[in-house]
């Protein structure tokens, strides 16, 4: 295949992988390919890296979403890398490695794609892979599941050092087709684009089958009497009655739009013994925190509680949530941390009824709900084969209030004055 086809092949692979929600969460993960082109300045052959840039989703990735970097320069950064304490500085250095105009802005994961010595690399966030990655004995389970075909990399926040860690693990395990990244996801590689994709799917499917065949029957514990899903009509009526109240509470700091989900996955989780302890442990994949916050608000009343009782309890729980969130911020914030972004929950779980999710617009609200469904799947998988053990709260905070993430938020267009507000127009039909 000629080198001109390398980006097209990468886009096609990314779109296929991103189209199946079992492979990665919305806008999660990134892919890359390396290849040789003729440098128009020197007429000499030069090696390039095409890698999904910052933002965007694999399922709809196009060529304009790829960052294009010179591999010789990217690899030379290893010699000036000042160490893990200052690894964030390396992101600015990526701009000095761009080829031509460079395409999309390079993401924090660019180091992993450049430093790991393989022509094609996929980094993904599949529920099955994260389930192993967040199991208390994830390293041993990865060995049991994959033998030496997939290696383990201890949790580390995404960045330059994680790229170096994965590159080293690959060097020490030349037979491996990829790695499980503790607390986070998976990375797979291949000599060709087809091989890389096949390796990604092999890891995702093997992990899912392992959980299926080795997992215990009721990972979330027994159904708690009274917390079963209400019949659909009753459930929807209660959701409709609660929706404006929940949205009002979730909009205390800033106007939010809401989304409601009462899928079987959600209702089943809400009916089980382990709902509250697991919800309290919070999500783990680095992508999740900015969308769902670390923890949801969980209503602790049975499904049959009246709307009035539930509203009273929601207000109490919301006040407690805000206090707890401010405590979490104060426990971990340093003088360099961005200011607290608001203490309202992004996810509200009501047993018997369903899940409300919130965001600054409709799409963000829906995606927050999708991410929490990912988190439920991850917790179920981890609890099936082991004990769910997400990364430490301090690490979660470091990601939620990461200065690089903050910079990304600041670059996003400011919401329009009426965004997130709902207007009721009456008498307009005359
Ligand atoms: Zn990731």
PLM region descriptions:
Residues 1-424:
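Glycine-rich flexible loops
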Residues 429-430:
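Conserved glycine-rich cofactor-binding loop
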């Amino acid at each position: 295949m000629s080198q001109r086809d390398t980006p097209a092949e990468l886009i096609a692979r990314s779109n296929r992988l991103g189209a199946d929600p079992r492979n990665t969460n919305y806008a999660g993960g990134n892919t890359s390919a390396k290849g040789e082109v003729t440098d128009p300045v020197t007429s000499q052959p030069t090696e390039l890296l095409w890698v999904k840039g910052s933002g965007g989703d694999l399922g709809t990735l196009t060529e304009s979403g790829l960052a294009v970097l010179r591999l010789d320069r990217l690899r030379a950064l290893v010699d000036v890398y000042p160490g893990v304490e200052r690894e964030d500085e390396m992101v600015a250095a990526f701009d000095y490695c761009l080829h031509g105009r460079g395409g999309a802005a390079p993401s924090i994961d660019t180091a992993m794609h450049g430093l790991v010595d393989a022509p094609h690399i996929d980094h993904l966030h599949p529920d099955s892979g994260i389930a192993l990655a967040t199991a208390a004995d994830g390293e041993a389970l990865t060995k049991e599941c994959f033998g030496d075909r997939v290696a383990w990399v201890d949790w580390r926040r995404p960045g330059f050092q994680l790229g170096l860690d994965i590159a080293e693990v690959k060097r020490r395990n030349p037979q491996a087709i990829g790695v499980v990244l503790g607390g986070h996801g998976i990375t797979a590689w291949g000599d060709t684009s087809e091989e890389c994709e096949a390796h990604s799917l092999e890891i995702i499917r093997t992990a899912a089958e392992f959980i299926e065949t080795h997992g215990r029957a009721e990972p979330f514990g027994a159904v708690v009497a009274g917390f079963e899903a209400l019949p659909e009509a009753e459930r929807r009526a209660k959701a409709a009655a609660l929706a404006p109240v929940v949205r009002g509470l979730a909009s205390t700091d800033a106007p939010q739009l809401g989304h409601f989900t009462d899928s079987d996955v959600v209702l089943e989780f809400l009916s089980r013994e382990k709902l509250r302890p697991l919800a309290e442990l919070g999500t783990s994949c680095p992508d999740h925190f900015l969308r769902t916050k670390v923890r949801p608000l969980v209503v602790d009343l049975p499904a049959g509680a009246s709307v009035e009782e539930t509203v009273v309890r929601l207000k109490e729980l919301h006040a407690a949530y805000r206090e707890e969130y401010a405590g979490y911020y104060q426990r971990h914030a340093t003088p360099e941390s961005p200011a607290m972004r608001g203490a309202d929950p992004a996810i509200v779980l009501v047993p018997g009824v369903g899940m409300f999710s919130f965001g600054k617009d409709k799409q963000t609200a829906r995606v927050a709900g999708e991410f929490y469904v990912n988190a439920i799947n991850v917790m179920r998988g981890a609890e099936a084969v082991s004990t769910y053990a997400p990364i430490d709260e301090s690490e979660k905070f470091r990601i939620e209030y990461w200065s690089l993430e903050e910079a990304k938020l600041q670059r996003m267009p400011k919401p329009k004055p009426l965004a997130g507000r709902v207007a009721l127009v009456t008498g307009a039909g005359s």
